[in-house]
From Swiss-Prot:
Recorded name of the encoding gene: mt-cyb
Regions that span the bilayer: 33-53, 77-98, 113-133, 178-198, 226-246, 288-308, 320-340, 347-367
Residues where heme b b562 binds: 83, 182
Cited InterPro entries: Cyt_b/b6_C, Cyt_b/b6_C_sf, Cyt_b/b6_N, Cytb/b6-like_sf, Cytochrome_b, Cytochrome_b_C_euk/bac, Cytochrome_b_N_euk/bac, Di-haem_cyt_TM
Cell location: Mitochondrion inner membrane
Membrane topology: Multi-pass membrane protein
Name of the molecule in the record: Cytochrome b
Natural source organism: Scomber scombrus (Atlantic mackerel)
Main location group: mitochondrion
Lineage, broadest ranks: Eukaryota, Metazoa, Chordata, Craniata, Vertebrata
Cofactor: heme b
Keyword DNA-binding: no
């Protein structure tokens, strides 16, 4: 008699996705990050739910309600620290997951890749509205600066900004709607992640050599479930260590001051995981141009599959393209550093050079390197 997991309508779906899924035998630790992102999402939804039970989305009491969570709620300090630092780990896993996709040519699964880019945008929006909720100085001014960027939209910009604010400045209406969005978006992300998996399982996973692996597949369970559990343990140990020993390491000290519309902080900057895009935004001395560059810095990922010129899928056997890939990694690190620096020389020019290099790598250098490698190898 067939096992229940293979016949039950619901269990069969889970079985095909997590137990009997044929997986390439040679996938490395870089393929762990999908499941780690699932763990991050589950952790964020769970801790966020408990925080929402005690949080008050009102300008008069939001800051105090967060203090109340940390002081008076049972393990509230831990829940809050896990949630705040969980966001950082979420983005670390996201960026490593995207880097893996770029290195091994996983972007050639176009539907899966594009849903992934939409997921990235959703996670970024969720993190942004979430950062506003504690209603500290950086929350308030970050919200003011970033929402104000929409005023660069021709003709309807100002109306659009006031519509999002729910008034003539960032105020109670803004905070209330941002809380509503922050509560809703994780469930939208969950649905999009299911779609992401659905498209992935139509094609099967890529592998480190970028070749068809249909002849050499093994079942997901037990091999990769146990391999993923090791990743889970490392991630949870890292997250709990950060939350317990140095919970404010990645935060901004300004956010311990309640929001004050009368006092502008000396340096307004977002959380570390947005700094690379913020640096690109600031590198263009024009509001609309900066906003378009900011959008392009993320949306350029959607163009990557169409600019793939190499006859090989992965970068495993392509040293020239590997050099460009690591140049891109270094460039993003430089942009992240510049985004946290004041807008003055020499940081302005460094940011501009790094921004030009960022777009050049995607649009010109990677396609050229792929074409050159084909020529050298005699693949026409």
């Amino acid at each position: 008699m067939a096992s229940l997991r293979k016949t039950h309508p619901l269990l069969k779906i889970a079985n095909d996705a997590l137990v009997d899924l044929p997986s390439p035998a040679n996938i490395s630790v870089w393929w762990n990050f999908g499941s780690l992102l699932g763990l991050c999402l589950a952790s964020q939804i769970l801790t966020g739910l408990f925080l929402a039970m005690h949080y008050t989305p009102d300008v008069e009491s939001a800051f105090n309600s967060v203090a109340h969570i940390c002081r008076d709620v049972n393990f509230g300090w831990l829940i809050r620290n896990m949630h705040a630092n969980g966001a950082s780990f979420f983005f670390i896993c996201l960026y490593l997951h995207i880097g893996r996709g770029l290195y091994y040519g996983s972007y050639l699964f176009v539907e899966t890749w594009n849903v992934g880019v939409v997921l990235l945008l959703l996670v970024m929006m969720t993190a942004f509205v979430g950062y506003v909720l504690p209603w500290g100085q950086m929350s308030f001014w970050g919200a003011t600066v970033i929402t104000n960027l929409l005023s660069a939209v021709p003709y309807v910009g100002t109306t659009l900004v006031e519509w999002i604010w729910g008034g003539f400045s960032v105020d109670n209406a803004t905070l209330t709607r941002f809380f509503a969005f922050h509560f809703l978006f994780p469930f939208v992300i969950l649905a999009a992640a299911v779609l992401h998996l659905l498209f992935l399982h139509e094609t099967g996973s890529n592998n480190p050599i970028g070749l068809n692996s249909n002849a050499d597949k093994i079942s997901f369970h037990p091999y990769f479930t146990y391999k993923d559990l090791l990743g889970f343990a490392v991630l949870l140990m890292g997250l709990t260590s950060l939350a317990l020993f140095s919970p404010n390491l990645l935060g901004d000290p300004d956010n311990f001051t309640p929001a004050n519309p009368m006092v502008t902080p000396p340096h307004i900057k977002p959380e570390w995981y947005f700094l690379f895009a913020y640096a690109i935004l600031r590198s263009i001395p024009n509001k609309l141009g900066g906003v378009l560059a900011l959008l392009a810095s993320i949306l350029i990922l959607m163009v990557v599959p169409f600019l793939h010129t190499s006859k090989q899928r992965a970068l495993t056997f392509r040293p020239a393209s590997q050099f460009l890939f690591w140049t891109l990694v270094a460039d993003v690190v430089v942009l992240t550093w510049i985004g946290g620096m004041p807008a003055e020389q020499p940081f302005i020019i460094i940011g501009q050079v790094a921004s030009v290099l960022y777009f050049s790598l995607f649009l010109v250098l990677f396609p050229l390197a792929g074409w050159a490698e084909n020529k050298v190898l005699g693949w026409t």
